[in-house]
């Protein structure tokens, strides 16, 4: 029998790549803590009608891309295709709105969509998202955009562009929808098949088409900003002014509509250079009606989600180097030396050091070669002599400097070892 392969559209994330994921996760976690956002963890599957009602039945996500199945209780269940609907469901069900003020939440985890796999696009993908629920103030819009901008900067992401638009209120959007359909109907036969299908079902998505001919037609379409009511225009003007005050550059893009029906007012995307058609790494906006449409009280909200696969692909392409340094690699030969080495390694780990012990039982020469390849800063060496004397040889791998230390003293040299390891890390990075 042949071996079982990973399912199409999914992939293994191997240790050499995991360090990039850990880097992104740790950076985001620290930044979001500083911004007073609290982590929320929701199930990866929900009742299907949550997404049908929340995202919109006319969207491509609901119509074409969801993983939906009947469970053993004959209930329709869907693997979550995005994080906002589940976060809002949790906000309502657990009565977080009763706590008053703005609920600043964030989440991280896998999402699932049946899409054509490609670079930076998988059927199981991962997102970091934020949701600020309870404020219609334009400052909330500016805050979440500023956090996304700061995260990209903190990660060292080069060359990104912020695109900005407003979808106005539901009333503004309906007026614009009618004008857009009237305009696009003149060119129906020239639109690509997907856009022809969307003309009556979800015409705003035509503005986001990647088809060259359709894009050309969309460029001359009515501008949604011309259909904003007074309140919507004032809100959007204030968001723009706040971003200018924050020194966050942006460009207006009236064709930016996002793919989910729940958006109102501000919509935005961060696009990166070097990712081709998968350039959008972060997208979001305001969704003032979603909470009430899912059965909760009227609650204005704004948020975004970052696609981790695309972000990590960019970090790798930019050759941003991350080192997951190991403090010690331990080699030993002989039953007594190996037993003592096991105890030494455990004691060092309990004192906060990272230690890998060679378990091969091979000759010292082969073990030392593995130590040099391990990326460790220092090597601990125990043979018969060291086992008899209760000592250990400590070799600094970058310099070759070696010293003999009593095992009992090694346990009491935590601060000195830490200082030497810090110095060794500095030398190895230069």
Swiss-Prot record:
Q: Does the keyword Chloroplast apply?
A: no
Q: Where in the cell is it found?
A: Cytoplasm
Q: Does the keyword Cytoplasm apply?
A: yes
Q: Name one GO cellular component term.
A: cytoplasm
Per the annotation, which location comes first and is thus the protein's main one?
cytoplasm
Could you tell me one molecular function GO term of this UniProt entry? histidine-tRNA ligase activity
Give UniProt keywords alphabetically: Aminoacyl-tRNA synthetase, ATP-binding, Cytoplasm, Ligase, Nucleotide-binding, Protein biosynthesis
What chemistry does it catalyse, as a reaction equation? tRNA(His) + L-histidine + ATP = L-histidyl-tRNA(His) + AMP + diphosphate + H(+)
Major enzyme class = ligase
Its EC number is: 6.1.1.21
Q: Which GO terms describe its biological process?
A: histidyl-tRNA aminoacylation
Query: Which protein family is named in the record?
Result: Belongs to the class-II aminoacyl-tRNA synthetase family.
Q: What do we know about how this protein assembles, alone or with others?
A: Homodimer.
PANTHER family membership:
HISTIDINE--TRNA LIGASE, MITOCHONDRIAL-RELATED (PTHR43707:SF1), HISTIDYL-TRNA SYNTHETASE (PTHR43707)
What is this protein called in UniProt? Answer: Histidine--tRNA ligase
Give the species.
Acaryochloris marina (strain MBIC 11017)
Biological classification of the source:
Bacteria, Bacillati, Cyanobacteriota, Cyanophyceae, Acaryochloridales
């Amino acid at each position: 029998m042949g071996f079982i392969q990973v399912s199409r559209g999914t992939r293994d994330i191997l240790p050499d790549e995991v360090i990039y994921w850990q880097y992104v996760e740790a950076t985001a976690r620290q930044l979001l803590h500083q911004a007073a956002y609290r982590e929320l963890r929701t199930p990866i599957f929900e009742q299907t009608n949550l997404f049908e009602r929340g995202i919109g039945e006319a969207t491509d996500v609901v119509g074409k891309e969801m993983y939906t199945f009947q469970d053993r209780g004959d209930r329709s269940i869907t693997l979550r295709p995005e994080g906002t609907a589940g976060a809002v469901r949790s906000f309502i069900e657990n009565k977080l709105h009763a706590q008053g003020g703005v609920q600043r939440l964030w989440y991280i985890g896998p999402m699932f969509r049946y899409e054509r796999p490609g670079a930076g696009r998988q059927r199981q993908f991962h997102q970091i998202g934020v949701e600020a629920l309870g404020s219609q103030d334009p400052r909330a819009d500016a805050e979440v955009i500023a956090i996304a901008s700061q995260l990209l900067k903190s990660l060292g992401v080069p060359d990104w562009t912020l695109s900005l638009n407003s979808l106005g209120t539901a009333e503004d959007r309906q007026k614009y929808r009618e004008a857009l359909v009237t305009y696009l109907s003149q060119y129906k036969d020239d639109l690509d098949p997907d856009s022809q299908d969307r003309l009556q079902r979800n015409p705003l998505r035509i503005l986001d088409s990647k088809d060259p001919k359709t894009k050309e037609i969309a460029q001359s379409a009515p501008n949604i900003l011309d259909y904003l009511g007074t309140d919507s225009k004032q809100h959007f003007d204030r968001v723009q002014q706040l971003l200018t005050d924050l020194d966050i550059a942006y460009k207006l893009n009236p064709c930016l509509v996002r793919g989910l029906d729940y958006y109102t007012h501000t919509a935005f995307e961060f696009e990166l250079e070097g990712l081709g058609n998968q350039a959008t790494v972060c997208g979001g906006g305001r969704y003032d009606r979603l909470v009430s449409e899912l059965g909760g009280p009227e609650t204005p909200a704004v948020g975004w989600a970052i696609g981790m696969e695309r972000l990590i692909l960019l970090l790798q392409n930019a050759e941003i180097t991350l080192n997951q340094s190991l403090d010690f690699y331990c080699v030993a030969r002989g039953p007594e030396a190996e037993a003592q080495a096991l105890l030494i390694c455990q004691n060092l780990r309990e004192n906060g050091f990272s230690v890998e012990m060679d378990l091969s039982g091979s000759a010292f020469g082969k073990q030392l070669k593995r130590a040099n390849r391990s990326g460790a800063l220092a090597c601990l060496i125990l043979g018969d002599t060291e086992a008899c004397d209760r000592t250990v040889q400590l070799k600094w791998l970058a310099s070759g400097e070696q010293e003999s230390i009593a095992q009992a003293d090694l346990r009491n040299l935590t601060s000195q070892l830490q200082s030497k390891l810090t110095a060794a890390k500095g030398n190895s990075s230069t």
